[in-house]
Amino acid sequence: MEVLIRALGRADAAAVGALYQQSAAHLRSLGDDTDFQFDAHAYLRDGFGPRPAFSGIGAFLDGQLAGYLIYAFGYETDRAIRQLYVLDLIVDERVRRQGIGRRLMHYAATLCRDAGGGELFWGVFERNELAIAFYRRLGATEVGGSRFMHLPV
């Protein structure tokens, strides 16, 4: 199985949107009641232009998008460390457990290091035990002592 990892582009919008919808259906089946709104239109609107909100890398198998990782760079002031925030890591359910997610995370780690960063950071739905187990196998640990909050504006 030859997997090509490359930056995502505008032409990947439909495939990204389709994989996102597959992931949203999986999370709903686990009880996630988020109003999942990301789609090909949001990908194009927010990922490109003069001030893109995120970047992405894709794993391609036989020319088809098999998985992707969308990220944004950030900074953690308490520890004075640059971070790569993983917004989404999604692998097509038909090709899971074949190393695609691992390869995307390793590629993201390289992007982070190359940008002067020191860690990857992300959130995971608390009932997504398969994802949590995968991240633990990578060596990730849970962050304690903080709660994530949001405030619509």
Protein language model annotation of sequence segments:
Residues 113-123:
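Conserved GNAT acetyl-CoA-binding A-motif
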Residues 89-96:
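A short, internal acetyl-CoA/4′-phosphopantetheine-binding micro-motif in the GNAT/acyltransferase core
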Residues 102, 106, 114, 126-145:
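Conserved active-site alpha-helix within GNAT-family acetyltransferase domains
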Residues 4-18:
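A short beta-loop-alpha structural element at the N-terminal edge
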Residues 45-58, 85:
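A short helix-loop-beta-strand connector motif used in the catalytic cores of GNAT acetyltransferases and
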Residues 54-67, 92:
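Conserved beta-hairpin
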Residues 21-45:
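Conserved GNAT-fold acetyl-CoA-binding loop/helix
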Residues 121-131, 150-153:
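Conserved beta-strand-loop-alpha-helix junction that forms the acyl-donor binding cleft
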